[in-house]
Amino acid sequence: MAKAKFERNKPHVNVGTIGHVDHGKTTLTAAISHVLAKTYGGEAKDFSQIDNAPEERERGITINTSHIEYDTPTRHYAHVDCPGHADYVKNMITGAAQMDGAILVVASTDGPMPQTREHILLSRQVGVPFIIVFMNKCDMVDDAELLELVEMEVRELLSEYDFPGDDLPVIQGSALKALEGEPEWEAKIIELAAALDSYIPEPERDIDKPFLMPIEDVFSISGRGTVVTGRVERGIVRVGDEVEIVGIRTTTKTTCTGVEMFRKLLDEGRAGENCGILLRGTKRDDVERGQVLSKPGSINPHTTFESEVYVLSKEEGGRHTPFFKGYRPQFYFRTTDVTGTIELPEGVEMVMPGDNIKMVVTLICPIAMDEGLRFAIREGGRTVGAGVVAKIIA
């Protein structure tokens, strides 16, 4: 059976379900799949297909994730659902599944629970920009006042973590009843889909963002000058553009005088392409791997930041022992390792393999970074953790 042709005629948006264990994330995922397939066409995925999440490896970390797709009249969605809490933590920190928005599932029979809070905090730390709430199991609550109380509680919790709790959409429904085909509850799934369409703005495509290319290699070509190679992370670079070389050393400006791909000369290099960029008047020794080439003023070098980190377990090939304050591993950003020191939160003495933890990192030399940048923590080339820049300090 040939795979269906991927049509790019609709904007593509990445979403996912988050929330406490057993609040109905996977059931909701199945319900969305069924109701939208029934209403707008497409393939419906069963609960068992979604629940049996395949194992993936991202930066050496084992994560179980289910990916499903569905359509509304105006958009195409890719949706991730994870079976276990640890999978969410790993997924969000490594950016294995970057979300343009998340659906927070809260059982109205329980109200917000510890992982509800933790997933909201993680969403804030890793930069999930929008959250929509689906209050599940509303068929099991007869008291309208109780539903109102749970909704207020969820909204307050979201506001506590700087999400617009008073303004974001909250849909009251029942994933199970919708999955069983009861029209009044199916209507709530359509309402949820409409909220996704209207509340989550269309994500800016990588190609429309300011140009950035991590430098992987530097060559000098006699008679032509210095060429840096790498994969363009975002934006477009055109011949004649002014660019900055950022990170590790003092930021310098130069001009792109040529773009090459597969030995062919081009006018421009675009997001996702591997290319060589010829720099005017730049010496071979002025640039090194680990720096980035970027649109002037679009990114700055920093050394100190707050991060959210997942420490690999022993089974994942991580450390066998905890680490303490004063730990000095390497932090791998894009293409290079930089040594740094860590500061643990107050009251935390040690960090065990398998933990996730907030820490302040100070690097020995500056790296071009924005909030949301992912990194690995390594010891002698072996990955022992994964992290994300949550807040830049200096």
From Swiss-Prot:
For molecular function, the Gene Ontology terms on record are: GTP binding; GTPase activity; guanosine tetraphosphate binding; translation elongation factor activity
Segments of this protein annotated with the region G3: 81-84
Record's keyword annotation contains Transmembrane: no
Domain of life (superkingdom): Bacteria
Principal location class: cytoplasm
Positions contributing to GTP binding: 19-26, 81-85, 136-139
Keywords in UniProt for this one? Cytoplasm, Elongation factor, GTP-binding, Hydrolase, Magnesium, Metal-binding, Nucleotide-binding, Protein biosynthesis
Q: Could you tell me where this protein is found in the cell?
A: Cytoplasm
G2: region residues: 60-64
Query: What Gene Ontology terms describe where this protein resides (cellular component)?
Result: cytosol
- Write out the catalysed reaction: GTP + H2O = GDP + phosphate + H(+)
On assembly, the entry states: Monomer.
Q: Which HAMAP family match?
A: EF_Tu_B (MF_00118_B)
State what protein this is by name: Elongation factor Tu 2
Gene coding for it: tuf2
